[in-house]
Amino acid sequence: MRTVAAAAGVSHQTVSRVVNGEPGVTDGTRDRVLAAMRSLAYRPGAGARALVRGRTEVVGMVVPHDPGFTFANDHLLRLIGGADTELAARGYGMLLSTRETGGGAASAYRRFDRRRLVDGLLVEAGVGADALPDLAASGYPVVVVGYTHQDVPCVHPDDEAGAYAVTQHLLALGHRRIGTVTGPSALASGARLRGHERAYADARRRLPADLTEPGDFTVDSGYAAAGRLMSRRHPPTALFAFNDGMAVGALRWLREHGRAVPGDVSVAGFDDTAAAGLVDPPLTSVSLHSTDLGRRAAQLLFDLIDERADPPRETVLPGTLVVRASTAPPRGHR
């Protein structure tokens, strides 16, 4: 560092400030230090190398922090894996950060960028996005993964169409009273509820007003919601949980209370996680093609990093209904 300082005609403290991206250095002085670093092939660490090259070849990814959910969430793991595969194919690495649900993307960006650690940011839906429009407006490459965003480039599944397909399937089997277990309103749950309601409307069937219960995408919330729904005076003949975790909880409640699936009650989930094919009976669900979702999000981020002309603001990937043994016609329709 002292050799660089001597070559640039500055103090070693100034070189340190340039290397660490700290304020208080004029543009001219910074340029002299960077030129000296290049001429001397100075390689003190990742931050300085990034300054010299102009690229870190690392992308940050921010996902929700929930010890009981994040890394037990097969959909999220596949999404991360898809993004990482695309990054690796282009010689990039991933720096993963977890943040409390509902905020934290901006603080993660500041931490990543303070030492020039990342070239762009992928933000998963559950983190929240209040601070992201300012980042995107500043020209910083950022992509939201998993839900639509008006002001930030995004890649997300067609949640409404997926839920429509599930409800249409259950209606076609003969179910009329379909109970729904929804998720947090800030996430994809709103789109899934719209799809469910639209399927009823298109089938010209009356939507039951008393068969919706909230959940939080956990197994326990699905268990509790199933209990509330099945305790109705006129209980549903089918349950549609807005993710597989809650559907697994519903299956557990039904089994513990002597209800056969699908003999007494059909059950469907959403996300088509690994659990969907492992539970008994195997669960009807909607595949979000999570690996491809992560890969496409990374591709869009590279379009922004490389400043390609007119990258898409929104990419919507269709899901696929996967029918398994947990759904069947209700009694009296067989």
Question: Where in this protein do the model-derived segments appear?
Answer:
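Short strand->helix junction
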Residues: E22, F69, S185-A186
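N-terminal helix-turn-helix DNA-binding module of bacterial transcription factors
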Residues: M1-E57, R331-R334
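A generic local structural motif
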Residues: G45-A48, A106-R111, G128-D130, A224-R228, ...
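Alpha-helical recognition/docking segments in bacterial nutrient-uptake
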Residues: V58-V62, D66-Q168, A172, L229
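Bacterial carbohydrate/catabolite-sensing allosteric modules
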Residues: A7, S39, G82-R90, A137-V144, ...
